[in-house]
Every structure is written in C-alpha cells, then in structure tokens.
C-alpha cells in the first residue's frame, strides 16, 4: 500500500486506474440536488406503468373476474 508518514501522520495516495477515470464524472455531482422537481414526474409515470403491468400479469395468472369473457388457455393459442 502506498502510505507515506509525514510528521507522524499517514497519508494514503490512491492508485489511478482506467475504471476509476471512467467512473469519476459520475461521482462529481455527489451531494448536489437539482432545483425543482427534476425527473420526479417521469419516475411517477414509470412506476404507474409498472403497476399496471403487474396487475395485468396477476389477473392473467389468477384468471380474474375482470377477464371472464376472455379465454385464457394455451389451447386457444394454437392455430
């Protein structure tokens, strides 16, 4: 490890790597908060779409009352 002692205090110097150089810009905005709502609305839309997707999958799995008129069987998919 690259540790150097100066005046009874140790200082560690990190090693530069190509992965670190690539990831450095992602960490440069740490602690900063954009003003306003930012992408909160977009995130809400995606959460709502995901909830609809989960409800559809659950209804197909349970053959729910909402799907009474729709045949849900693998044999109906055959030509």
Swiss-Prot record:
What PTMs does it carry?
Answer: Phosphorylation is a light-dependent reaction catalyzed by a membrane-bound kinase; phosphorylation occurs on Thr residue(s) in the N-terminus of the protein.
Its chief place of residence is plastid
> Do you know which SUPFAM superfamilies this protein is assigned to?
Photosystem II 10 kDa phosphoprotein PsbH
> What keywords is this UniProt entry annotated with?
Chloroplast, Membrane, Phosphoprotein, Photosynthesis, Photosystem II, Plastid, Thylakoid, Transmembrane, Transmembrane helix
Q: Organism's domain of life?
A: Eukaryota
Q: InterPro entries per the record? A: PSII_PsbH, PSII_PsbH_sf
Q: Which GO terms describe its cellular component?
A: chloroplast thylakoid membrane; photosystem II
Is Thylakoid there in the keyword field?
yes
MF (Gene Ontology): phosphate ion binding
Q: Which residues carry this modification: Phosphothreonine?
A: 3, 5
The record's subcellular locations are: Plastid, Chloroplast thylakoid membrane
Instruction: Give the protein family.
Output: Belongs to the PsbH family.
Role noted for this protein: One of the components of the core complex of photosystem II (PSII), required for its stability and/or assembly. PSII is a light-driven water:plastoquinone oxidoreductase that uses light energy to abstract electrons from H(2)O, generating O(2) and a proton gradient subsequently used for ATP formation. It consists of a core antenna complex that captures photons, and an electron transfer chain that converts photonic excitation into a charge separation.
The annotated subunit structure for this chain is:
PSII is composed of 1 copy each of membrane proteins PsbA, PsbB, PsbC, PsbD, PsbE, PsbF, PsbH, PsbI, PsbJ, PsbK, PsbL, PsbM, PsbT, PsbX, PsbY, PsbZ, Psb30/Ycf12, at least 3 peripheral proteins of the oxygen-evolving complex and a large number of cofactors. It forms dimeric complexes.
Any idea what this protein is called? Answer: Photosystem II reaction center protein H
Look up and give the organism this protein is from.
Answer: Coleochaete orbicularis
Q: Which gene encodes it?
A: psbH
